[in-house]
Amino acid sequence: MAVQGFQRRLLGSLNSTPTAIPQLGLAANQTGARCLEVSIPDGLFLSLGLVSLVENVLVVATIAKNRNLHSPTYCFICCLALSDLLVSGGNVLETVVILLLEASALAARAAVVQPLDNVIDVITCSSMVSSLCFLGAIAVDRYVSIFYALRYHSIVTLPRARQAIAAIWVASVLFSTLFIAYYDHAAVLLCLVVFFLAMLVXMAVLYVHMLARACQHAQGIARLHKRQRPLHQGFGLKGAVTLTILLGIFFLCWGPFFLHLTLIVLCPQHPTCSCIFKNFNLFLTLIICNAIIDPLIYAFRRQELRRTLKEGLTCSW
């Protein structure tokens, strides 16, 4: 395979020299043609990773501290934050080790680096898969709370939520282990791509259905109070914008990475695909950006969580 889904960069760093200053420019691909390559500075990548780590640690600590936040909804949000934390942590750890190896500040043998690389890859991959799963779980939780409001607490119970969380983590680790072990098999990569597309479609269908129900509810309230039609139109427009932002961020941050995996299967030697492969680190950076955005969308917008976080920060000072 021309390009691996998860590059084995640690082993390659044992005998490498420090890279030049990253830049945006044209690079030659395998056929000698010119293509656009976006290189991400290590400092920027590490900074984004640290921001994500801090944000998601705050979310996990806040939910763990307040017993009022130990509901199924917040459990899913907490696990999403934990997954994003591991995504960022795995990439930051790998980057730091690579930089130390390149600077000859860390002496290591291939026999030691290989298992470390495998462990980091499994952690990163499993946290990516679990992050997608918990995004879907949050969407399902919201859907049930809207369409089955009266039976929500009997349907989405804490024991069931814990069982779902355990199943997601176990499945993510098992699948990621297989993915890392058989990364050069097209079927494994296609399974991961199909999983992403299924999650995207499921989230889009659920949120569009929720938006339609919300618009119907707003229209009913407007008729009850004999309000004007523009109010309903404004609500629908606001909901559509929110939905577009939510799904747009999800697709923008995750789509390029899974496009990368798809092209590995479809055209591993094609010049155009080779140009796209050169931007793998950019695709990882977009996933880190998603780990930064997730707490802003799913956690910090909730008043109870913000209040608990504010109290915790105030007491710490």
Swiss-Prot record:
Lineage: Eukaryota, Metazoa, Chordata, Craniata, Vertebrata
Extracellular face of the membrane: 1-37, 94-118, 184-191, 267-279
UniProt main location, coarse: membrane
GO molecular function, one term: melanocyte-stimulating hormone receptor activity
SMART domains in alphabetical order: 7TM_GPCR_Srsx
Lipidation (S-palmitoyl cysteine): C315
Keywords associated with the record: Cell membrane, G-protein coupled receptor, Glycoprotein, Lipoprotein, Membrane, Palmitate, Receptor, Transducer, Transmembrane, Transmembrane helix
Assigned GO CC terms: plasma membrane
Protein name per the record: Melanocyte-stimulating hormone receptor
Membrane topology designation: Multi-pass membrane protein
Family according to the record: Belongs to the G-protein coupled receptor 1 family.
Cytoplasmic face residues: 64-72, 141-163, 212-240, 301-317
Quaternary structure and interacting proteins, as annotated: Interacts with MGRN1, but does not undergo MGRN1-mediated ubiquitination; this interaction competes with GNAS-binding and thus inhibits agonist-induced cAMP production. Interacts with OPN3; the interaction results in a decrease in MC1R-mediated cAMP signaling and ultimately a decrease in melanin production in melanocytes.
Signal peptide range: none
Gene Ontology biological-process entries: adenylate cyclase-activating G protein-coupled receptor signaling pathway
Compartments (UniProt record): Cell membrane
Gene3D superfamilies: Rhodopsin 7-helix transmembrane proteins
Transmembrane stretches, start-end: 38-63, 73-93, 119-140, 164-183, 192-211, 241-266, 280-300
Sugar attachment sites: N29
Protein function: Receptor for MSH (alpha, beta and gamma) and ACTH. The activity of this receptor is mediated by G proteins which activate adenylate cyclase. Mediates melanogenesis, the production of eumelanin (black/brown) and phaeomelanin (red/yellow), via regulation of cAMP signaling in melanocytes.
